[in-house]
Amino acid sequence: MTDLTSLTLAEARKGLADKTFTSLELTDAHLKAIEAARALNAFVMETPDQARAMARDADARIGKGEGGPLAGIPLGIKDLFATKDVRTTACSKILGNFVPTYESTVTAQLWRDGAVMLGKLNNDEFAMGSSNETSCFGPVGNPWRREGSNTTLVPGGSSGGSASAVAALLCMGATATDTGGSIRQPAAFTATVGIKPTYGRCSRWGIVAFASSLDQAGPIARTTRDAAILLRSMAGHDPKDTTSVDIPVPDYEAAIGKSVKGMKIGIPKEYRLDGMPAEIEKLWSEGAAWLKAAGAELVEVSLPHTKYALPAYYIVAPAEASSNLARYDGVRYGLRVPGKSIGELYENTRAEGFGAEVRRRVMIGTYVLSAGYYDAYYIRAQKVRTLIKRDFEDCFAKGVSAILTPATPSAAFGVGEKGGADPVEMYLNDIFTVTVNMAGLPGIAVPAGKDSQGLPLGLQLIGRPFDEETLFSLGEVIEQAAGRFTPVRWW
């Protein structure tokens, strides 16, 4: 029998339906893989007993012909999603050993459809980071290494545990979240597929908040088909989330293999950065050529406010974060560090509970929201955001179906290599992805090639609001042309 962990989610679904193997066998194979891959530090909480119980239940349901769309499929869950009776910390000391008494809407829908939970996945603290180095559980290792090198690389962030676990074949797919690129950048760094759906497509209820107007849940998977299968279960209207949009969820899987003939693909001239590596430029041209060969039409488009996106994002996101993170005060749950007064208790708890990057962003956010600077920074950033959104609207109004860009400005870098002295160096990782969150649009990252050192590189497709289907169709064209890449096992 093939090693069960090497199957795609779609292949595993067929094997379970055909009774070639059971969910318990599939789950056990992944639990063994997780145990053998602890050096990657992808999981911060393993739930083997719960996983086996869920797998047995799935097998019973499949036996009766009552299995749901994800019956028996073992998944990893980012530690930002509340999981009932299972520790959820957002990878921050301040949440301590917090155990939710409720389930996030997205994970509840996965369990409704029969999925199995293998455990909780590592991420940057409160999803603030682009390398998964800010987690209180320590950094995550990327399953990929440079050819001939033993240097451990970052998997990207903030959903680094999700991307690493999927790439290392520790789970068949994973939940993730994306505020400025936290699904797409790790996917590009690990040769996995990651989609950030349109804002409002997936419920945010029960997900630890970072920046509420930007956060969106989505899947990281091995293939575009697998990502489409997962997104169908994760998406849907939720009355508990006022930003959730009440529109039907299409069958995303049906978009896989659909013709892209006649589609107009925008190539934005503003994404050609000064000093952009030749490998990224070449990859972008190759991706465009593949789409053209499949019958799509390439058109140059302009997104003139792109250059303001990153500074505007790093005002809006910290501003919302400083407000959202005010609730962690040591009074109701999580860490409490005593003080002589209530004010001192707050100060001590937050100083000890938050890591350096979270403290930095809370300070930036508080500063830009303060009386003297609110108009100069926050209001101006919101105006820029409106202009960015308008750029995309103008582009789509001209008949463009999707926009093709690089996913990241480079391949994965070494743990500890960036952002030590200058956080802006780390923030520049989000240069191609933040515009999508600022405009609330869907974006997918698909593996498209490797750099000269054998590291994966990804391309990004940006779609019209609620048109994730087109992204899956186009993404699959790139996937078929580029082929699939798997890392050489070192862990």
Swiss-Prot record:
* Alphabetically ordered keywords of this record: ATP-binding, Ligase, Nucleotide-binding, Protein biosynthesis
Residue numbers annotated as active site: K78 (charge relay system), S158 (charge relay system), S182 (acyl-ester intermediate)
Q: Does the keyword Protein biosynthesis apply?
A: yes
Spell out the InterPro entries in the cross-references: Amidase, Amidase_CS, Amidase_dom, AS_sf, GatA
Q: List the disulfide bonds.
A: none
Q: What class of enzyme is it?
A: ligase
EC? 6.3.5.7
The molecular function terms of the Gene Ontology recorded here are: ATP binding; glutaminyl-tRNA synthase (glutamine-hydrolyzing) activity
Q: What does the record give as the reaction this protein catalyses?
A: L-glutamyl-tRNA(Gln) + L-glutamine + ATP + H2O = L-glutaminyl-tRNA(Gln) + L-glutamate + ADP + phosphate + H(+)
Q: A GO term (biological process) for this protein?
A: translation
Domain of life from the UniProt record: Bacteria
Q: Name one GO cellular component term.
A: glutamyl-tRNA(Gln) amidotransferase complex
Query: Which SUPFAM superfamilies does the annotation name?
Result: Amidase signature (AS) enzymes
Query: What Pfam families does the database record attribute to this sequence?
Result: Amidase
Function summary: Allows the formation of correctly charged Gln-tRNA(Gln) through the transamidation of misacylated Glu-tRNA(Gln) in organisms which lack glutaminyl-tRNA synthetase. The reaction takes place in the presence of glutamine and ATP through an activated gamma-phospho-Glu-tRNA(Gln).
Q: How does it assemble?
A: Heterotrimer of A, B and C subunits.
Of which family is this protein a member?
A: Belongs to the amidase family. GatA subfamily.
User: What is the protein named?
Assistant: Glutamyl-tRNA(Gln) amidotransferase subunit A
**The organism of origin for this protein:** Bradyrhizobium sp. (strain ORS 278)
Q: What is the lineage of its organism?
A: Bacteria, Pseudomonadati, Pseudomonadota, Alphaproteobacteria, Hyphomicrobiales
Name the gene for this chain.
gatA
